[in-house]
């Protein structure tokens, strides 16, 4: 029998301080990823996704730091030209390392220092928060007609729906992609973190539909 995630069995993610909400989101995510009762496989898939998500977040932050470093090293005379050339070089030549003079902190690894400041589970929590709906639409029949009535969602149901949307979006993305499911899932989570992606679109569409049907609230019986 597989135990739920605790701070003890996630100790190897040393930079991530797990809050109660993050633990709850992680356990719920694993349960919704599970197929045919294979929880160990779902746990492995979840942590593969976290590793890919952390690399993606680290890569994006490294690009931002590199661009800030470029701006800091500009000369007053040709600052605009340097900025354009170096930023194009940074975006187009991803395999080529751009060396930027930074403050020497002995021989410490800049990436490891940056890694310590990034919590991948915090990214996951923010991503889920960005796609979590606050309302749902319930069908009610009145005089032979069916009306869609906005209703407030409980926090548990809203979080579950957000996770389902992210997983479903990743599955659809995998059908038209050469990436594996963990890569697609990490990409969808990161898109949600940026308030983008299919899951965010579903949330916005649901909220728009709720606003459009707000006049039907008078038919609510609960």
UniProtKB/Swiss-Prot annotation:
Keyword annotations of the record: Mitochondrion, Ribonucleoprotein, Ribosomal protein, RNA-binding, rRNA-binding
Gene Ontology cellular component terms for the protein in this record: mitochondrion; ribonucleoprotein complex; ribosome
Domain of life, per lineage: Eukaryota
Subcellular location: Mitochondrion
GO molecular function, one term: rRNA binding
Plastid recorded as keyword: no
Coiled-coil spans in chain: none
InterPro entries the record matches: Ribosomal_uS7, Ribosomal_uS7_dom, Ribosomal_uS7_dom_sf
GO biological process terms held by the UniProt record: translation
Main subcellular location: mitochondrion
A Pfam short name: Ribosomal_S7
Keyword Metal-binding annotated: no
Function in brief: One of the primary rRNA binding proteins, it binds directly to 18S rRNA where it nucleates assembly of the head domain of the small subunit.
Oligomeric form and interacting partners: Part of the small ribosomal subunit.
Family: Belongs to the universal ribosomal protein uS7 family.
Protein name: Small ribosomal subunit protein uS7m
Organism: Prototheca wickerhamii
């Amino acid at each position: 029998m597989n135990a739920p995630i605790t701070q003890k069995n996630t100790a190897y993610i040393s930079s991530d301080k797990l809050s109660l909400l993050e633990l709850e989101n992680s356990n719920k995510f694993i349960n919704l990823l599970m197929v045919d009762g294979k929880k160990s496989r779902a746990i492995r898939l979840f942590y593969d996704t976290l590793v890919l998500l952390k690399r993606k977040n680290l890569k994006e932050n490294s690009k931002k730091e590199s661009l800030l470093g470029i701006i800091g090293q500009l000369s007053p005379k040709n600052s605009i030209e340097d900025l354009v050339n170096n930023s194009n070089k940074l975006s187009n030549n991803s395999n080529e390392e751009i060396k930027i003079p930074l403050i020497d902190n002995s021989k410490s690894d800049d990436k490891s220092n940056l890694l310590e400041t990034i919590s991948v589970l915090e990214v996951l929590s923010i991503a889920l928060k960005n796609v979590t709906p606050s309302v749902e639409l319930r069908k009610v029949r009145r005089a032979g007609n069916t009306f869609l009535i906005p209703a407030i969602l409980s926090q548990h149901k809203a979080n579950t729906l957000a996770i389902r949307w992210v997983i479903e979006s990743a599955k659809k993305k995998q059908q038209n992609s050469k990436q594996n499911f963990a890569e697609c899932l990490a990409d969808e989570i990161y898109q949600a973190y940026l308030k983008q992606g299919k899951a965010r679109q579903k949330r916005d569409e649901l909220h728009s539909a709720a606003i459009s049907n707000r006049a039907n609230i008078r038919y609510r019986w609960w």
